[in-house]
Amino acid sequence: MSKLRVGVVGLGGIAQKAYLPILSQAADWTLVGGFSPNQQKAQPICDSYRMACFSGLDSLAQQCDAVFVHSSTASHFQVIGELLRYGVHVYVDKPLAETVEQGEQLLALAEKQGKALMVGFNRRFAPLYRQLKQDMNQPASIRMDKHRADSVGPNDARFTLLDDYLHVVDTALWLGGDAGQRLSGSLRINDVGELVYAEHHFECGETLVTTSMHRRAGSQRESVQAVTDGAIYQVNDIRQWLREDSQGVLEQPAPGWQTTLAQRGFDGAIRHFLASVSNQTLPETAGEQAIAAQRVIERLLRDANL
């Protein structure tokens, strides 16, 4: 079987930091090339990864089986729609689109075209989070915190919730069993409409789930704590694992050989998508799973009149 031909749309920071370093290590696929409207900036990036620099989305799509989209959220609806109509499988950075309605249209188009459309919720593929989900026995509560040292603004609260808090909601509800009912919560917005703090409480079956983010906490800390039947688990910064029970505390650091991109789930997400395309199976974060957390965020925004 011939190797998958892979392309990249949008060659900014996230593509350069998280995706191209993995995609360029092609073994089971071929990295064909990239496209960005800013050809002057795109050319040296493509040259550095020894891939073609395409002048248009159409010409890239015609040479690819699957494309990774890292362009602005505002462009997602148009870019993904075009790629799907060209018959290309698509992986896109979260959120899927600017609105849930646009996302639903893209999911319907992907189903109609018979193509995979996966949203890159990389934390679902972080090894320690996957281990936690597997090992938890009857979790009573799960709490996820993802804070920023000093990142209030410059964007408004809506942008920050869809750009960053979305990760917290998606990961926490996935750990809790996906379908969550919101019980309570609060958004603290400053005088110019920027998010300062968010905390929400959900019920996922028998599990209570809490999400929390402070934009000026003086720390970049990310942690998940799970209180379960027989043990308490703590995962710190996606690289340190602690399990406490009656026998004591077991600490399991991430393997020294494991890259940061693997720890944070980017490597797993990329390989899962490409394997799904090759095997013609549905990616984990496709369909309703691609948009469930965004539905929650949009309800938070409506309830807060944002």
Predicted feature residues:
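Beta-loop-alpha module in the N-terminal Rossmann-like domain of NAD(P)-dependent dehydrogenases
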Residues: Y49-Y91, P95-L106
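C-terminal glycine/acidic-rich active-site capping loop/insertion
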Residues: N122, Q225-E288, A292, L306
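Mid-domain beta-loop-alpha active-site segment that forms a flexible
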Residues: G120-P127, D150-R182, A269, Q289-A290
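C-terminal helix-rich "cap/oligomerization" subdomain common to oxidoreductases
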Residues: C46, S59, A66-V69, K115, ...
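Contiguous beta-strand/loop segments that form the cofactor/metal-binding neighborhood of enzyme cores
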Residues: D163-Q240, D267, R271-Q280
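Hydrophobic residues in well-ordered beta-strands that form the structural core
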Residues: A15, S55, V92, L117-V119, ...
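A contiguous active-site-proximal alpha/beta segment in oxidoreductase catalytic domains
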Residues: A97-V152
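N-terminal Rossmann-like dinucleotide-binding module
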Residues: M1-Y49, N137, L274, L306
